[in-house]
Amino acid sequence: MKIILSPAKKMIVDTDNLAPVELPVYIDKTAEVLNWMKSKSKEELKAIWKCNDKIAEQNFNRLENMDLYNRLTPAVLAYEGIAFQYMAPSVFEIQQFEYLQKHLRILSAFYGILKPMDGVTPYRLEMQAKVGIGDAKNLYEYWGELLYRSVIDDSRIIINLASKEYSKCIEKYLTPQDRYITIVFCELSGDKLVTKGTYAKMARGEMVRFIAENNIENPVEIQKFDRLGYSFRSDLSSDSEYVFERKIK
């Protein structure tokens, strides 16, 4: 069983705590992406990044001095977005790190796919960015089937906790033999169940923690998730979609 998760824009360098275990599997392709980005002007990159001048300047300077092989941070500690804050890997015990290293995969526009303990450096790049490298018209084409092939294992079970922007990288290549379960977090708004971005990100991180703490190998066990006010809605769920509703007090 593999769990897929989106990355986060906000990243840090932390070389004082855990050391990375290895380099990302597609580091050579990452080097190609880096070279392509370095060939662009500051204005071109600002358009790709869709950010203000200050953030563009910070990331342009990062690119100029980027080293893919030294001063690296384990991926699961490098990302600082909401999902990763609620996952709270900095307080994991060794058994949880070992579980995640085996089961969690972080999808990345820059690195392709990451194990939690792969060494990374801060970058800014989203999968839907207008980036054409070689014959590939965009990053979905650039990474192609590689990410799916890296995620699928003998169980053929994938738990999707990624956003649509990233899960698309996997869904295109699914086969009838695969069991792909998308997790939906929602709450009642008026008379409709809706997904609210911030709460969904919180829940994704919390669910990764729940799965790791309970050493889950069978997807059915995920239905027991009951944190942050969420509970499983069996009446709205199916074999390919688990729906969790947050009760608002």
Where are these regions (language model features)?
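Short hydrophobic beta-strand segments
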Residues: K2-S6, I157-N160
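Active-site helix-to-loop segments that bind/position phosphate- or nucleotide-bearing substrates
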Residues: I4-V91
